């Protein structure tokens, strides 16, 4: 599997399962309606586990532009690959969100509240305060990326090659990373919905705005959209700088 395709496919799978549980909890007349935050955070952790297991051997399973930036700043990933990885991740997020809509189309139609429908695509804060919201995303992503540096190696041996290649996160322990995302969601996610991943938010938000906004009568809330993009990039950069400084 090509590394770029792996990032696309893995991110699409991540969003299908992750935003899928949000739709199951938030939309009307689903079997999981109103089952709560614990269900959402747990399923997101499982989604991370599944996506990482599938794509780890092929691309390092970044599945997150902030992780890609952080690993590159750490010096464990080629800057030449960064644009392609990020593009693949964002497009994967768009496709995953479209699949969620197809799966839950009737339930979207049965739901009138705009905020509930938008939540199935992208994040929004519980209390809108942009500086604090930005700090929340920075801190959450800092924890994610900094701990990932301790959980995984820097290199990966690609199929068909004999040498270790600095292509991504390496031979990844998917379960610890999933538990890490679960912990972030439970502890820090209640403020902004813990995007901690620009592709997780921007990709589905683009799908909503470009293809589904009129059908769902739901706006993409572009006024907030910069927070779950800028915040994770800052958090990842700080994690890389701090890790390099102390190691």
Language-model segments: residues:
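Membrane-interface helix-loop junctions and terminal tails of multi-pass membrane proteins
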Residues: 1-247
């Amino acid at each position: 599997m090509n590394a770029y395709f792996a990032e696309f496919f893995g991110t699409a799978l991540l969003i299908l399962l992750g935003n899928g549980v949000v739709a199951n909890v938030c939309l009307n007349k689903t079997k999981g309606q109103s089952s709560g935050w614990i269900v959402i955070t747990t399923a997101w952790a499982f989604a991370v586990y599944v996506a990482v297991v599938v794509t780890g051997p092929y691309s390092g399973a970044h599945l997150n532009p902030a992780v890609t930036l952080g690993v590159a700043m750490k010096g464990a990933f080629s800057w030449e690959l960064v644009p392609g990885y990020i593009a693949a991740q964002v497009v994967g997020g768009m496709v995953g969100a479209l699949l969620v809509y197809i799966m839950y189309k009737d339930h979207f139609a049965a739901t009138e509240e705009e905020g509930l429908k938008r939540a199935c695509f992208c994040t929004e804060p519980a209390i809108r305060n942009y500086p604090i919201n930005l700090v929340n995303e920075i801190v959450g992503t800092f924890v994610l990326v900094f701990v990932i540096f301790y959980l995984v190696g820097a290199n990966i041996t690609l199929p068909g090659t004999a040498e270790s290649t600095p292509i991504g996160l390496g031979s990844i322990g998917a379960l610890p990373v999933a538990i890490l995302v679960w912990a972030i969601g439970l502890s820090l996610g209640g403020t902004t919905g813990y995007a901690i991943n620009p592709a997780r938010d921007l990709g589905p938000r683009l799908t909503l705005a470009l293809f589904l906004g009129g059908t769902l009568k739901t706006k993409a809330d572009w006024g907030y959209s910069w927070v779950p993009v800028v915040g994770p990039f800052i958090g990842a950069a700080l994690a890389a700088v701090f890790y390099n400084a102390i190691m």
